[in-house]
Amino acid sequence: NNITDWVIAGARQDERFELVAVCSRTQERANEFAAKHGIPHTFTSLEEMAKSPLIDAVYIATPNYVHAEQSILCMSHGKHVLCEKPFASNAREVRQMVETAQKQGVTLMEAMISTLNPNFAIVKEHLKDLGTIRRYFASYCQYSSRYDKFKEGIVLNAFKPELSNGAMMDIGIYTVYPMVALFGRPQKVEAQGIRLHTGVDGQGAVNFQYEGMNATILYSKIANSSLPTEIEGEKGNLILDKIHITNTVDFIPRQVVGQGQ
């Protein structure tokens, strides 16, 4: 998919990187991908690829429900792993992944671009300008191109719970990840959402409680929103145009209208 193409293009900007192999379920698809990107070796068995001395690290961009299994397999053979978001289907699987990485002495990283965006560093740098922070609000609502098919009775992968898909796993995570990166683990969580007939969440809203601060996230694959993300402090606000890939960050200082206002 496009994301994999972007990752490869970005990685090739580093002269230390060499793309040596690809693994796919069929030889035909492996050959097609290898030809597209100039990859010398192909595999149809992930275990065989994980055992290969040709490889130092693996990028995993498979369906969500196999992320943990495949990451653990690769790490068990001493390979570093960059795994697409979401890391896994649940917290138990994530713990198993982290434990395997620690045991094997390898690097395990989630491919979450939003907190690696240069503008996210700007946000972190200027949090102090906000004074005491009182609220984090983030919204990522994007009508899915696959939802019209869903309403026609054609259920594509994006709306299949058995693949660990759904709105939170696909795009809601982009609103949560920066929040935790900036403010840590919340004290309390309350959530509500709309569940589609297949069992996946189509959209949702989650409230988080921190010491002296509230956080709210909105996410959807069945409706659009143009709302930006905002971090509100007693001395001003930071406004991010898009939480998943931030292009602009604006600081709006609190205006003192008059004494007692």
Task: Give a label for each model feature.
Residues 7, 37-100:
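Beta-loop-alpha module in the N-terminal Rossmann-like domain of NAD(P)-dependent dehydrogenases
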Residues 257-261:
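C-terminal helical cap and adjacent loop that interface with cofactors, partners, or active-site loops
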Residues 1-37:
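N-terminal Rossmann-like dinucleotide-binding module
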Residues 175-248:
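Contiguous beta-strand/loop segments that form the cofactor/metal-binding neighborhood of enzyme cores
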Residues 43, 83, 108-110, 240:
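Hydrophobic residues in well-ordered beta-strands that form the structural core
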Residues 114-187:
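Predominantly a Rossmann-like dinucleotide-binding segment in NAD(P)-dependent oxidoreductases
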Residues 95-113, 132-136:
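Rossmann-fold dehydrogenase core element
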Residues 18-21, 56-58, 108, 165-166:
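Short active-site oxyanion
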